[in-house]
Each structure stands twice: as structure tokens, then as C-alpha cells.
Amino acid sequence: MTDSAKPEVSGLSFEKAVAELESIVARLERGDVALDESIEIYERGEALKKHCETLLSAAENRIEKIRLDRAGKPRGVEPLDGA
């Protein structure tokens, strides 16, 4: 896939972003990429990493735990971290 054909990082799902990031890491670890291309894919990797962190943070904020009343019955939900 050429650089112009790659989708915008912000439009990728978490799973697709991680898969592309893993591919970039593998290419860089092999060491068979020209310096200019290495810099370009490293920069895309940084953007993918940031995007994944943003998506994970958003997912963590959505996770809730169930509150129980004294009888042990579900009473509602609250943020997982208690905030």
C-alpha cells in the first residue's frame, strides 16, 4: 500500500491501528528499509501509537462497575475508578 493509499490514522479502528503498528515495528526491526522511508514509517507509527492510546483511554472511561445494595442486588453503575 502506498502512503497516499493508507487511510487516515484517525479513521482506523483500534485493531487495525495496532495491526499496522505491528507491521511497522517488524519492518523497522528487519532493518531493510531505506533511511528516508524508515523516518516516514516511524512517524506514522508514532501517530498510530497516539491514536491507540486515545482509543484505549476512551474505552477505559466507558467501563463501569455495578453497584450493589446491602442485599447484594444490582443498584446502578459507577465509574470503574470510583471517580
Curated annotation (Swiss-Prot):
Catalytic activity as recorded in UniProt: Exonucleolytic cleavage in either 5'- to 3'- or 3'- to 5'-direction to yield nucleoside 5'-phosphates
EC number assigned by the record:
3.1.11.6
Query: Which keywords, in A-to-Z order, does the entry hold?
Result: Cytoplasm, Exonuclease, Hydrolase, Nuclease
The record, for Gene3D superfamilies, names:
Exonuclease VII, small subunit
Per UniProt, subcellular location reads as: Cytoplasm
* GO terms under cellular component: cytosol; exodeoxyribonuclease VII complex
GO molecular function list: exodeoxyribonuclease VII activity
Q: What Pfam families is this protein classified in? A: Exonuc_VII_S
- Where is this protein chiefly located? cytoplasm
Which InterPro entries does the protein's record reference?
Exonuc_VII_S (IPR003761), Exonuc_VII_ssu_sf (IPR037004)
GO term, biological process aspect, one: DNA catabolic process
Reading the lineage from the top rank, the first entry is: Bacteria
What assembly does the database describe for this protein? Answer: Heterooligomer composed of large and small subunits.
Q: What does this protein do?
A: Bidirectionally degrades single-stranded DNA into large acid-insoluble oligonucleotides, which are then degraded further into small acid-soluble oligonucleotides.
**Recorded family membership:** Belongs to the XseB family.
Report what the protein is called: Exodeoxyribonuclease 7 small subunit
Organism, per UniProt?
Rhizobium etli (strain ATCC 51251 / DSM 11541 / JCM 21823 / NBRC 15573 / CFN 42)
At the highest ranks, the source species' classification is:
Bacteria, Pseudomonadati, Pseudomonadota, Alphaproteobacteria, Hyphomicrobiales
